[in-house]
Amino acid sequence: MTSSTRRAAAAAAISLALASFSVPASSQQFINVLTGGTSGVYYPLGVALSEIYAGGISGSRTQVQATKASVENLNLLQQGKGEIAFSLGDSVQMAWEGNTEAGFPGKLDKLRGVAAIYPNYIQIVASADSGVKTLADLKGKSLSVGAPASGTELNARAIFKAAGMSYQDLGKVEYLPFAESVELIKNRQLDATLQSAGLGVASIRDLATSLKINVVAVPGSEVAKIGSPYIAVTIPANTYEGQAEAVETAAVGNFLITHEGVPEEVVYQMTKLMFENLPKMVASHAAAKAIDPAKALDGMPIPLHPGAERYYKEAGILK
């Protein structure tokens, strides 16, 4: 072997050794946060999460994706097109069961739980001029029930079924995101909107400052007919401008969900960082005040991701 050949062989050996210690380009962790419409609560909370992860997970690249929310988010996770997503609990349950009528092609068996976060209040709001004050008053009126194949739309179906009504009782049904629904009401082209979101959602606040509204009650007796995971709650008086009295309605828990393909360490860090940065979450939207690690496993409808499980064991929440 010539000296030049020996030098080349040595260089190749050193290069190979260094390669074994270098960080491959594929090790960069991309984190796509699946949220909902930009006028809802999922979106600002998702932005906050993205910023928390970008600053706390070394080598991560984060992105926030606006979607049609729960159903779309869960389908995207199953396809590996997101790393963490917001979803309503009943949607998660139906996805795990493979409920095709709810918009799932089959059992979404790759989904894994991260945390229960805050309740979504089912908020039915009508313009005062529409005369709609009760669920029965919606008969013959126009109502937006949320984007097609969204968790909100599934909530709408459950509420009407419990009340002995269906979409056929309405004058017109629109399948629109929150902000678009509000714009139609402002323009007198729609009577009411049903929005499943955290209290103080921006779209309804916007509507309430633009015209007089009625917040329509969903009586506790109707909520009881639906059963779990729905619970009877109250929208406090003055949550929205002109809402002088507390209003009964239903609520469903929200969850953060991931999928089995996301590495354990990444999910561990995502879970840990969220709970360590709750003030930033609350600053993005007041709904985050309800996020509590002690309640993070309440009602979890699917198996936990090992990374989340590791965090809860370290925190003493899971034995």
What are these regions (language model features)?
Residues 24-27:
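Boundary at the C-terminal end of the N-terminal hydrophobic targeting segment
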